[in-house]
Amino acid sequence: MAPQAHDRDKALDLALAQIDKNFGKGSVMRLGEGVRQPIAVIPTGSIALDVALGIGGLPRGRVVEIYGPESSGKTTVALHAVANAQAAGGIAAFIDAEHALDPDYAQKLGVDTDALLVSQPDTGEQALEIADMLIRSGALDILVVDSVAALVPRAEIEGEMGDSHVGLQARLMSQALRKMTGALSNSGTTAIFINQLREKIGVMFGSPETTTGGKALKFYSSVRLDVRRIETLKDGTDAVGNRTRVKVVKNKVAPPFKQAEFDILYGLGISKEGSLIDMGVEHGFIRKSGSWYTYEGDQLGQGKENARKFLLENTDIRDEIEKKIKEKLGIGADVTAATDDAAPVEF
């Protein structure tokens, strides 16, 4: 047995040497050889969602799918991720296939609209080709495609109304994702695909809901987020926002099926302060007695809205609560580029 093992080791060494010669050093390596770096992430803007994702945000160099019903907060979640990437000095691009991006709203969420790269392509092929070229440049930190449903194949645009184009969009997405995934990993770019829901006809058992663009995106996505509006927030009789639930239905970088709930306020986006209050109460840092919220003996306010306003005005207390929650849960976000000499940025 020993001579055979020696021969196998020798044959493997020869094969590895030949591979290194043909394809460059490091083309094949043993998994335990290098020091494994923690997965770099981009925060989502909601501490509850960062915790549900298990690593503190959306993973870099991966495909992320955000889907849900209309007006559930899909684009808002994506824009908050863009704002956080830009805040750390990153470059962001937005492929607006729906031609519906509101620059004023994006600005209110913290997006640097002057620096944001925007494309409003005519066809699905053009949109995905632009996305692929931007990713391969290696300069991008985050790219958002809004939405997959709006990526209309050229043949469909040039054809007549009523023409059948079965499977064109699915084939387009499958080809694009095959090309993109390797480039995403090499460049450390996070690609967010926003998707819409459709209903399958004739489904008797199970959910009839499905997403557009075929099955390729489901397979290539490292993270899939199901965004749902569960409640309307009111100030008296006026609707001021939505209570949103996000379920992590797929997660390749941490345990899946966790849920997060947070408030999205109209015109303001995800309420960071609201998320901190919810998480603070859950983990015992903030005490709720009746309708009053207190932190270390100091009253934050009566009712969640007053407590939110207090934290908005007193950023030092807000930052202190956030730090304690993140320390307890062991999450911290590194949104820097995936390079050896880059210093990590702690959030």
UniProtKB/Swiss-Prot annotation:
Gene Ontology molecular function terms on file: ATP binding; ATP hydrolysis activity; ATP-dependent DNA damage sensor activity; damaged DNA binding; single-stranded DNA binding
A GO biological-process term: DNA recombination
Pfam families documented for this protein: RecA, RecA_C
GO cellular component: cytosol
Subcellular location, principal: cytoplasm
Key words of the record: ATP-binding, Cytoplasm, DNA damage, DNA recombination, DNA repair, DNA-binding, Nucleotide-binding, SOS response
Binding site residues for ATP: G68, P69, E70, S71, S72, G73, K74, T75
Subcellular location: Cytoplasm
NCBIfam families for this protein: tigrfam_recA
Annotated function: Can catalyze the hydrolysis of ATP in the presence of single-stranded DNA, the ATP-dependent uptake of single-stranded DNA by duplex DNA, and the ATP-dependent hybridization of homologous single-stranded DNAs. It interacts with LexA causing its activation and leading to its autocatalytic cleavage.
Family: Belongs to the RecA family.
Name used for this protein in its record: Protein RecA
Lineage: Bacteria, Bacillati, Actinomycetota, Actinomycetes, Mycobacteriales
